[in-house]
Structure formats: structure tokens, C-alpha cells
UniProtKB/Swiss-Prot annotation:
Catalyzes the formation of S-adenosylmethionine (AdoMet) from methionine and ATP. The overall synthetic reaction is composed of two sequential steps, AdoMet formation and the subsequent tripolyphosphate hydrolysis which occurs prior to release of AdoMet from the enzyme. This is S-adenosylmethionine synthase. It is found in: Cytoplasm. One of its GO terms (biological process) is S-adenosylmethionine biosynthetic process. It holds the Pfam family S-AdoMet_synt_N. It catalyses: L-methionine + ATP + H2O = S-adenosyl-L-methionine + phosphate + diphosphate. Disulfide bonds: none annotated.
């Protein structure tokens, strides 16, 4: 293995970023449909811009959802509640353009024949490939750069909502973390942290430069140093806080937001492959979402069981077909106990049922308890213990199957 050092970078965005506003509205609409009718089929897309929200997509459900009320509630909770933001929950226009799903798709998902057991009853909602990943870089078994990037913007939002310090904060923000690794893929240190946060105008009597200096110090002391372990920060670590200076205009007024445009933020920060399908606004019959959750579950249990230090899982489907077309597991040369990837994959395939209905039942994706889909729509779908696909309950079964 090479011993040359290298850098790796991941980014995240806050719940107030326009693309994340769109994701959260889409998932809040999905939550309401699922709550009223667990068998709802939903593909909900949201567009947000200055003073306007458009919600569209395809739905088959017995539920009746007030899209306007849900969108305004979501925007309020994110924090867009002032007219000066040019995107205000109370005054923005909201257009709903949801319509019924194609019966051709529904026919493929709800199968009526070729059934060996009940889990063969539901075919995949579309073709495609999905990836899951886990590694030992953090306690959450997530890549470190994305984990830190998510925690930075999450803490920034908590501080903003608490309103005790940094009272100038506005909802939009981004983070980026660059780590230095040794040739054995161990994190050595933080090379750079970038945080851009929207803020109020500078107070009277304070120049832009003075205000930005205050913001920089506050972000370093109250956010970065609370999230990133002190041992990883040294005198050469670079902090770029609002590097362009003033950041007053932001959110959907600064940039148009769309559902599904932050798929790398949602997953592993570029540390693992991505099948290309977004998550938010999609009911669990859509394998873009449910199978990506299941693939993470498989990868995390393999790493948690001590079978490998890294694990990538790929699963693929054909529309209307329940059983995966292919499953692929790669431990990147980090497998333990003399195990081959083939041995690990053989046991994993026997233990983890990756048919869509089996995934839905295993995680109660049609009846979420203790979480909701909107919870997933900001700060990452993985590495957060509240979600059932993060459980490592299969560790003992995996180890026993492999004679460990």
C-alpha cells in the first residue's frame, strides 16, 4: 500500500440552503401522505425561488394533503419568517401541481403474479443501481470529512434557532472540510475548513471588515472547535469563513432551489460511489431511496462486525422485479480474519433480504416511528442513529455465519 499522504474534501449545506428547503418540503409532503395512507405512492418535486414555491409530481394515495399548509409550516420551521429575506413563509406564493401516477408504473410495482412469498408481491419502482458505504473513520462509521461538514452546519442552525449567541445568523449556510490522510487511509489532521453563513447587515457603527472579523471568530470558537476534535487542528489548519465577505442575500432569493440537487451531501460526501438517484420526495417503493438505505445497513453491519475497515455495497434492480438483479460487495482490501469479499458477500446475501417490500418492513419505512422523512432531508441520511438503517443488529448473525 502506498505511504504517500493525500487530501480529501467533503461539503455540506444547512437546512436553509435553497436546495435543502426544496428537499424538506418534498419530504414533509411525503410524510403527510404516508401518515394518512402507508401505501401511498409519491414522487414529489419542489422548486423554490424569490417569493415562490412550486410543488409538483405524481401521487397515488387515499390521503388528502394540504400542500400549502405543509410548505408554509416547513419554511417557518427552517427560519424564513421575515419579509427582508425575500422568501417568507407567510407571504410566498405556493402552487401545487401534484397529479396521479402513471398506471403503467403502478402495475410494475404492485405485482399480482409470480409470487413465491409476500415479499415478491412488490416489484422495484424503477431500474437503477444504489450504493451503501461504511468505514471506521468515525464512531458513526462514516467518512470523517462529510461527518464533520454535516455537524458544522447542523450546529450553526442550532445556535441560530436558540438565539442566545450569534444573533445575526440567517438560515442559509454551507460548510466544507479538507482532511489530510496518510498512505494507510488514516486521518492525520484538518487541512482546511470553509464555512459560509448568511447574516444580517452589519450593526450601525461597525464596518463590513470589522463585522466579518466578528463572524469569523464566532464561527471558529462556537462552531468549528465544538465539532472538530482539537487533536486534528494545528497551526497550519486554514479557516475560510465567509471568504467573499458579505453574505446577506441568500436562501431561495439568492439561488433557486430544487429537490434532489444535493445527492452527495445526502450520502457520503464523495467518498463512495453514487447511483445517481435522489431521495427526497420519494416513497419507499422507490428503490433509489429504500435500497440506498438498505445498502448502507449492509455495509455498516459488515464494518461494525469487524469484518473490514471499509465496505462498499452496490445493489441493482429492474422495474417491476422484486429480487435484485445484482449485488456487489467490495472491502477495498481491508477485510479481516482472512475473509474474502466473496465469502462476506455470500453470507450477507443470505442474511439481508434486499427485495423492496422486505426493506420496507425491516425499517418500517411505510410507518416511520420516532423519525420522519423530513428529518432525513437536511444534514445527511446516514451516520445519524435515529434512523433504523443505522442499527447494527445483524453483527452477531454475520459473525456467526462466518464462524467468528
Amino acid at each position: 500500500m502506498s505511504h504517500s499522504r493525500y487530501y480529501f474534501t467533503s461539503e455540506s449545506v444547512s437546512e436553509g440552503h435553497p436546495d435543502k428547503v426544496a428537499d424538506q418540503i418534498s419530504d414533509a409532503v411525503l410524510d403527510e401522505f404516508i401518515k394518512q395512507d402507508p401505501n401511498s405512492r409519491v414522487a414529489c418535486e419542489t422548486f423554490v425561488t424569490t417569493g415562490q414555491v412550486i410543488v409538483g409530481g405524481e401521487v397515488t394515495s387515499k390521503g388528502i394533503v394540504d400542500v400549502q399548509t405543509i410548505a408554509r409550516k416547513t419554511i417557518t420551521e427552517i427560519g424564513y419568517t421575515k419579509g427582508e429575506y425575500m422568501f417568507d413563509a407567510n407571504s410566498c406564493g405556493i402552487l401545487s401541481a401534484l397529479h396521479s401516477q402513471s398506471p403503467d408504473i403502478n402495475r410494475g410495482v404492485d405485482r399480482k403474479e409470480e409470487i413465491a412469498d409476500e415479499f415478491d408481491r412488490v416489484g422495484a419502482g424503477d431500474q437503477g443501481m444504489m450504493f451503501g458505504y461504511a468505514c471506521t473513520e468515525t464512531p458513526e462509521l462514516m467518512p470523517a470529512a462529510i461527518q464533520y461538514a454535516q455537524e458544522l452546519v447542523r450546529l450553526l442552525a442550532e445556535i441560530r434557532k436558540e438565539g442566545k449567541i450569534m444573533t445575526y445568523l440567517r438560515p442559509d449556510a454551507k460548510s466544507q472540510v479538507t482532511l489530510e490522510y496518510d498512505g494507510n487511509d488514516n486521518v492525520l489532521r484538518v487541512e482546511a475548513v470553509v464555512v459560509s453563513t448568511q447574516h444580517d447587515p452589519e450593526p450601525a457603527g461597525m464596518s463590513e471588515a470589522e463585522f466579518q472579523a466578528v463572524i469569523k471568530n464566532d464561527v471558529i470558537e462556537n462552531v468549528i472547535k465544538k465539532v472538530i476534535p482539537a487533536k486534528l487542528i494545528d497551526e497550519n489548519t486554514k479557516f475560510h469563513i465567509n471568504p467573499t465577505g458579505r453574505f446577506e442575500i441568500g436562501g431561495p432569493h439568492g439561488d433557486t432551489g430544487l429537490t434532489g440537487r444535493k445527492i452527495i451531501v445526502d450520502t457520503y460526501g464523495g467518498a463512495a460511489p453514487h447511483g445517481g438517484g435522489a431521495f427526497s420526495g420519494k416513497d419507499p417503493s422507490k428503490v433509489d431511496r429504500s435500497a440506498a438505505y438498505a445498502a448502507r445497513h449492509v455495509a455498516k453491519n459488515i464494518v461494525a462486525a469487524g469484518l473490514a475497515d471499509k465496505c462498499t455495497v452496490q445493489v441493482s434492480y429492474a422495474i417491476g422485479v422484486a429480487r435484485p438483479i445484482s449485488i456487489y460487495i467490495n472491502t477495498h482490501g481491508t477485510s479481516k480474519h482472512g475473509l474474502s469479499d466473496e465469502q462476506i458477500q455470500e453470507k450477507a446475501e443470505a442474511i439481508f433480504d434486499l427485495r423492496p417490500l422486505a426493506i420496507i418492513r425491516r425499517f418500517n419505512l411505510d410507518r416511520p416511528h420516532g423519525w420522519c422523512y423530513r428529518d432525513t432531508a437536511a444534514y445527511g441520511h446516514f451516520g445519524r442513529e435515529q434512523f433504523p438503517w443505522e442499527k447494527t443488529e445483524k453483527v452477531a448473525e454475520l459473525k456467526a455465519a462466518l464462524g467468528l
